[in-house]
C-alpha cells in the first residue's frame, strides 16, 4: 500500500498548517535510529508472524530511487525477509520493520535498516535481507558484534543464503550462486 506517492512528494504540499508531534518508542533494544525526509515515498505492507501477531513492513525512499526493479520492491523484500526469519529462527520482536534509502551501503538497528538509495534488484534484495538478518544475529541472540564479529557476519551470511534460496522461488539465488563460481 502506498502511503505517500511520488506525486505527493513532488507536489510538496501540506494538508494542514498545524504542527504534528510524532512519538516513537521501541522496547528491549540496546540501540536505536530513526529517519525523516519530506522527499520520501512511503510504502507499507502487513507482515504475518508465525504466532498470528502482525508487524508492519515500511519502506521510505526518494523519488529518484523509485522503480519496479529498484525501491518499489523494498517493502516486498522486507516482508519476505522478516516472515522467513520469523518462521525459520525466532519471531520478529518489533511492531515495524523499516527499510530506509540512504547514502550508506547498509546498516542495521532494532526495527530499522538503512540501505543504499541506488541499490536495485538482486543488490537491493541482498542488502535488505542481510541488514534485517542482523536483527537475529547479533540483536536477538545478544552477541557482542565488536568482540565476536565472526558470529555477527558469519551466522548472518549463513541465514542470508537460506533466505535468498527461499525468496520468490529462488529469484536471486541462482544469480548469487553463479557469481561465487
Which residues fall in each region the model found?
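Residue-level recognition of alpha-helix boundary/capping or hinge positions
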Residues: 15-19, 176-181
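Zinc-dependent metallopeptidase catalytic helix centered on the HExxH motif
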Residues: 72, 114-179
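Hydrophobic helix-coil surface modules that form long, contiguous segments used
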Residues: 1-129, 158
Amino acid at each position: 500500500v502506498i502511503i505517500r506517492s511520488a506525486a505527493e512528494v513532488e507536489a510538496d504540499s501540506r494538508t494542514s498548517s498545524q504542527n504534528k508531534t510524532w512519538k516513537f518508542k521501541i522496547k528491549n533494544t540496546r540501540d536505536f535510529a530513526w529517519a525523516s525526509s519530506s522527499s520520501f515515498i512511503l510504502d507499507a505492507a502487513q507482515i504475518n508472524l508465525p504466532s498470528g501477531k502482525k508487524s508492519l513492513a515500511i519502506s521510505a525512499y526518494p523519488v529518484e530511487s523509485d522503480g519496479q526493479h529498484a525501491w518499489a520492491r523494498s517493502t516486498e523484500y522486507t516482508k519476505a525477509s522478516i516472515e522467513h526469519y520469523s518462521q525459520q529462527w525466532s519471531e520478529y520482536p518489533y511492531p515495524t520493520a523499516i527499510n530506509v534509502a540512504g547514502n550508506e551501503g547498509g546498516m542495521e538497528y532494532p526495527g530499522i535498516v538503512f540501505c543504499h538509495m541506488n541499490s536495485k534488484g538482486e543488490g537491493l534484495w541482498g542488502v535488505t535481507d542481510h541488514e534485517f538478518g542482523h536483527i537475529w544475529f547479533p540483536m536477538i541472540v545478544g552477541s557482542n558484534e565488536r568482540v565476536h564479529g565472526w558470529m555477527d557476519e558469519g551466522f548472518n551470511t549463513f541465514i542470508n543464503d537460506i533466505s535468498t534460496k527461499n525468496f520468490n522461488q529462488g529469484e536471486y539465488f541462482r544469480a548469487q550462486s553463479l557469481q561465487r563460481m
